[in-house]
């Protein structure tokens, strides 16, 4: 059973193990989970997951796998064997790819990570989608991919909080993981479709990914506590 008692996931967006662990040392695994992304994992490989789990953290491995079905499924299996709590793949990889990932996890014994689909990145707006041949609103594409993910047996979705309400209404069984969360008064940085933590939960998000407002705070533990207090 997870020790974490909140929906907060802190993004460890750092280039080195030392920097990531320095922040982790200031955080309480009862108050947050942690996310390991491409930069940190490429630098440290599975060692960083092992180190974070050793400190009691649930780890969200945010590598957004996207490849042919067998290759993606084997990557998801490797993540599960690493002991991660959550792993994600791009829904745009298609139904067969997502279903292969679901199947490989069901064939394993022991704890299973949550299998999450990535819909439309929170940095993308309509003009960005048009640039890759999809001349539709991001919300429309999100709903299309969500239906595909549910059909494939995914546990949930990564989505903007602005899509959460519609997704919960259409797919109530899917758990929603929302990046781009910025506490009131924080800079937007490179996220575009954002809400505050309280707004995101009220909209239907189940987990909230928060990066710089905590990781770059003068006192990360205090910043985390403030977010948790906002959600109480």
Curated annotation (Swiss-Prot):
Q: Which GO terms describe its cellular component?
A: cytosol
Q: Per its UniProt record, what SUPFAM superfamilies does this chain match? A: Ribulose-phoshate binding barrel
* Enzyme Commission (EC) number: 4.1.1.23
Main enzyme class = lyase
Q: List the disulfide bonds.
A: none
Question: Which reactions are catalysed by this chain?
Answer: orotidine 5'-phosphate + H(+) = UMP + CO2
Pathway it works in: Pyrimidine metabolism; UMP biosynthesis via de novo pathway; UMP from orotate: step 2/2
Cited CDD domains: OMP_decarboxylase_like
Give the record's keywords alphabetically: Decarboxylase, Lyase, Pyrimidine biosynthesis
Tell me the GO BP annotations in alphabetical order. Answer: 'de novo' pyrimidine nucleobase biosynthetic process; 'de novo' UMP biosynthetic process
| Pfam annotation, one family | OMPdecase
Record-annotated residues binding substrate? 13, 35, 62-71, 122, 182, 191, 211-212
Q: Where is the active site?
A: 64 (proton donor)
InterPro entries recorded: Aldolase_TIM (IPR013785), OMPdecase (IPR014732), OMPdecase_AS (IPR018089), OMPdecase_bac (IPR047596), OMPdeCOase_dom (IPR001754), RibuloseP-bd_barrel (IPR011060)
On subunit structure and binding partners, the annotation says: Homodimer.
Q: Which family does it belong to?
A: Belongs to the OMP decarboxylase family. Type 1 subfamily.
Q: What does this protein do?
A: Catalyzes the decarboxylation of orotidine 5'-monophosphate (OMP) to uridine 5'-monophosphate (UMP).
- What name is this protein filed under? Orotidine 5'-phosphate decarboxylase
Give the source species. Answer: Pseudomonas syringae pv. tomato (strain ATCC BAA-871 / DC3000)
